[in-house]
């Protein structure tokens, strides 16, 4: 419920700040005896999730994605959601054995582990909390027929924090 209420509260504000479409609620429903959770009606965005395209096709949206992050990564407003995982500096996250398992068996496993450990050594972001999407992976990036970034969806993890965390999902 908290993820949805974060979207309901903050997307009307963030929609005016970014250069692409976001699922700003058209209607917000309250929990009831029929359905015990908050709910929203949001617009449908035609296009294709970047995750459904090959890497070369995804590359066409990079300029739009950069513009989106420039628009989004500004000082967060007071009361912005806090998230115990998203928005934290990458080097402050618990190193998870799942990373070692994920790269095990790859020819480049040693290089990936070395790179991960180097990233963890980067100094923390200290320029103040900015808006962070929190889950900006290719499945949440909608590209139009031209391959341009048209919409960014799934804002349940929106938070204030380190902008680099948006590049880690």
Provide a role label for each language-model segment.
Residues 1-89, 126:
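ATP-binding pocket architecture of kinase catalytic cores
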